[in-house]
């Protein structure tokens, strides 16, 4: 086996992604960014079709959840996630958005904000993406600047509605397609957008001092080497020789030792919070670990089935339920990277919960999940997100 290239950590690392309505140009912008930076030797140009193919691979039994591309600016190293726009991929948006320190919201000036624009802003708010930069795309197709101004105002209002600083959020106008096609003026716009991202989205303070924890997104086997769990390190650090536990979904906890850490197919001395890595585990078979579990420092996190959640229930207009729900309602709770069915018990004096309500209720999960206070989750029903919340208290 050829010796892997070593990944050198020289610049601060930031996770970002493109969000927004289907066909507004998220993937075109992602491709344009890699192309423009590749010309400066800071990225490998990725074809639109390669990036766009990521969501399709689910059907063929391979779980590639979102397209990951990497690039650098003069100041930073970025891992960029392109979250597919279709409702079918909301689950991926949830695992994807959870991995963003900031996001580029792409809005087509020809359309203005659309239903998924709103849904992605809501999801960004709920999964803790605190910084959004707006790219108003396709501005070359709008003759009247005042119309573009109007769209910008609408986007700012929408961001403010979800507690983002709508008045202060930077907005860049341009054409991702023209940049991708090599228009020099639009290539400069893309570089300007990246400067804005460099400046506006702060380098996150990584919780590297906390105990190691990584939600498992995918599991695969490398012949002759063993089982690899991949995901984004939530907190702490991990290196070869570390003891870890596989926690969640099952009653028993499995202990293992880390025998390899890789990032972007390169070996890594130390994986730390925020890195997307593959972790090779000693003595663990493929069927002993699954998506939705977590890898954690031994003893640092426990499984629970009962918790109190602070929840926002989406309105019909946001794509949520059309009708209220009552105690004993049994939706899916999406934790870390997987759905678990749970039964809701409403507090005394609350007869029912209407779409649009904020509510605190108790949940009894069917399977144990690695839980703690502050963990975010979404509530889903029939493949649609109907609410989002945060664990306010663990009860068992």
From Swiss-Prot:
Domain tr-type G: 11-205
Locations listed in the record: Cytoplasm
Binding site for Mg(2+): 27
GO molecular function list: GTP binding; GTPase activity; translation elongation factor activity
Binding site residues for GTP: 20-27, 82-86, 137-140
UniProt key word Magnesium: yes
Region G4, annotated ranges: 137-140
G3: annotated segments: 82-85
Catalytic reaction equation(s): GTP + H2O = GDP + phosphate + H(+)
Region of interest called G2, as start-end residue ranges on this chain: 61-65
Tagged with keyword Protein biosynthesis: yes
Keywords of this entry: Cytoplasm, Elongation factor, GTP-binding, Hydrolase, Magnesium, Metal-binding, Nucleotide-binding, Protein biosynthesis
GO CC term (a single one): cytosol
E.C. number: 3.6.5.3
Protein origin, superkingdom: Bacteria
Location of the region described as G5 in the Swiss-Prot/TrEMBL record: 175-177
Primary enzyme class: hydrolase
Pfam families found in the cross-reference section: GTP_EFTU, GTP_EFTU_D2, GTP_EFTU_D3
Region (G1): 20-27
Chain coiled-coil ranges: none
Alphabetical list of InterPro entries matching this protein: EF-Tu_GTP-bd (IPR041709), EF-Tu_GTPase (IPR050055), EFTu-like_2 (IPR004161), EFTU_2 (IPR033720), G_TR_CS (IPR031157), P-loop_NTPase (IPR027417), Small_GTP-bd (IPR005225), T_Tr_GTP-bd_dom (IPR000795)
HAMAP family tied to this protein: EF_Tu_B (MF_00118_B)
Subunit comment: Monomer.
Function recorded in the entry: GTP hydrolase that promotes the GTP-dependent binding of aminoacyl-tRNA to the A-site of ribosomes during protein biosynthesis.
Family per similarity comment: Belongs to the TRAFAC class translation factor GTPase superfamily. Classic translation factor GTPase family. EF-Tu/EF-1A subfamily.
Descriptive protein name: Elongation factor Tu
Taxonomic classification: Bacteria, Bacillati, Bacillota, Bacilli, Lactobacillales
């Amino acid at each position: 086996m050829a010796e892997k290239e070593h990944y050198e950590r020289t610049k601060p690392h930031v996770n970002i992604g493109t969000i927004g309505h289907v066909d507004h140009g998220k993937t075109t912008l992602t491709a344009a960014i890699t192309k423009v930076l590749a010309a400066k030797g800071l990225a490998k140009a990725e074809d639109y079709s390669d990036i766009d193919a990521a969501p399709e691979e689910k059907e063929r039994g391979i779980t590639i959840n979102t397209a990951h591309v990497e690039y650098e600016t003069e100041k930073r190293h970025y891992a960029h996630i392109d979250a597919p726009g279709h409702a079918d991929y909301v689950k991926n948006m949830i695992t994807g958005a959870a991995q963003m320190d900031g996001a580029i919201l792409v809005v087509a000036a020809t359309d203005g904000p659309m239903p998924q624009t709103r849904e992605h802003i809501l999801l960004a708010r709920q999964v803790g993406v605190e910084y959004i930069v707006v790219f108003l795309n396709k501005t070359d197709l709008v003759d009247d600047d005042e119309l573009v101004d109007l769209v910008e105002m609408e986007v700012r209002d929408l961001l403010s509605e979800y507690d983002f600083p709508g008045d202060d959020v930077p907005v860049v106008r341009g054409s991702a397609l023209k940049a991708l096609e090599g228009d020099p003026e639009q290539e400069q716009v893309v570089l300007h957008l990246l400067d804005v991202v460099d400046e506006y989205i702060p380098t996150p303070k990584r919780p590297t001092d906390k105990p190691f924890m990584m939600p498992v997104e995918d599991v695969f086997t490398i012949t002759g080497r063993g089982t690899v769990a991949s995901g984004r390190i939530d907190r702490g650090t991990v290196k070869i020789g570390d003891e870890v536990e596989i926690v969640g979904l099952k009653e028993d906890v499995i202990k293992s030792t880390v025998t390899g850490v890789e990032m972007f197919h390169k070996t890594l001395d130390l994986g730390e919070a925020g890195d997307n890595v593959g972790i090779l585990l000693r003595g663990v078979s493929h069927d002993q670990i699954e998506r939705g579990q977590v890898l954690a420092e031994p003893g640092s996190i426990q499984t629970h089935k009962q918790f109190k959640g602070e929840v926002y229930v989406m309105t019909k207009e946001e794509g949520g339920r059309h009708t209220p729900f009552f105690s004993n309602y049994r939706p899916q709770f999406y934790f870390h990277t997987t759905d678990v069915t749970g039964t809701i018990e409403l507090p005394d004096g609350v007869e029912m919960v209407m779409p649009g309500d904020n509510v605190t209720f108790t949940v009894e999960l069917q399977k144990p999940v690695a839980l703690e206070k502050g963990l975010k989750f979404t509530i889903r029903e029939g493949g649609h997100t109907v609410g989002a919340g945060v664990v306010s208290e663990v009860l068992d």
